[in-house]
Amino acid sequence: MSVPRLGVGLQYNPELIGWFPFLDQPLDALEVLFDSVMGPLDGPGLISPRSADIVRDAVGSFPLLGHSNYGGDFGFDDLLSTAAALRHVPLAKQFGVSWVADHCFYSDGSWSDVWSSPLQFSRAEAARVAARARALQDLYGVPLAHENAAYYRTCPGSDLSEEEFLALTLELSGTYLHLDLHNLYANAQNHGASGYSIERFLDTIPLERIISIHMAGGRWIDGQYHDLHDTQVPEAVWDLLDEVLSRAQPGAVILEYETQALHADGATLDTERTTDLILADLERARQAWDRAYGPGSRRTTRDKVGSWTPS
């Protein structure tokens, strides 16, 4: 499957809509959270009525990428009964997305804490997940990329490392990797003492299967580091971006901001300051991309700085 080389973009998060000027930015791509815009499974509409205007504006402005958190992609319900098949697949086709990324957790009630509940890193689960991933990619008709998750503990029964599990799943499924660099950083903070290694992770995964990258920030709370997307990107994650861009050729780097402001606890929302911080991160990501691939390599700069042919 072909993957377009786009550049640097943002995730179109509902918590920012209304005060962050998405449509005024020279974005190379916009990532849409399918879970946030889809209509309920027990209703008649594909798109939630409250999201219709938002989606219409986005579709006409940028190349779109899809993202699934709660599609039940890797759970145990019949795949064709999941939100992924019933809502995310038709949304992907309607939006004309270049690819879809999904989170590597169960998201179907298998664990009580869905967000921080990783898949079981085992050979048996790699085979089961790969079969579902291959079938889901066929339904989408575009590349499906799996996002490495931030997690607080591994699933009981795991007999592989996270990176070994991902590499085996990709080998068996023929799907792709959506590399979240902040999730790598978060896991290293929380599990480094027990042997988690970013260097080993990057040396093990098939770098040629990376088609997109996530960048975000987070913070320490009560002795654990959390992937909250509520700060600017940490310096160590910028260093990881430079390293990965030197070793792989993704189609896009997407920045994520999930809370209403990048501010200290208890502070009042300052949209002007927060907008400036997000724009500063965007510009820094563009600079990293341009250092790696050249100033004419992004979608918004190719016509301005000549053509570019990926290797």
Language-model-detected regions and their locations in the chain:
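Gly/Pro-rich active-site loop or hairpin
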Residues: 41-46, 78-79, 118-126, 187-250, ...
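Hydrophobic faces of well-ordered beta-strands that scaffold small-molecule active sites
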Residues: 6-12, 28-32, 64-68, 100-102, ...
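Boundary/entry segment of secreted carbohydrate-active catalytic domains
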Residues: 1-22
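Active-site acidic/histidine proton-transfer and metal-coordination neighborhood
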Residues: 81-176
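Acidic (Asp/Glu)-rich catalytic clusters
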Residues: 20-26, 44-66, 80-98, 134-139, ...
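Acidic/histidine-rich catalytic cores of soluble enzymes
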Residues: 137-224
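C-terminal helical cap(s) of enzyme catalytic domains, especially alpha/beta-barrels
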Residues: 264-298
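Active-site beta-loop-alpha junctions enriched in small/polar residues
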Residues: 11-15, 33-37, 69-73, 105, ...
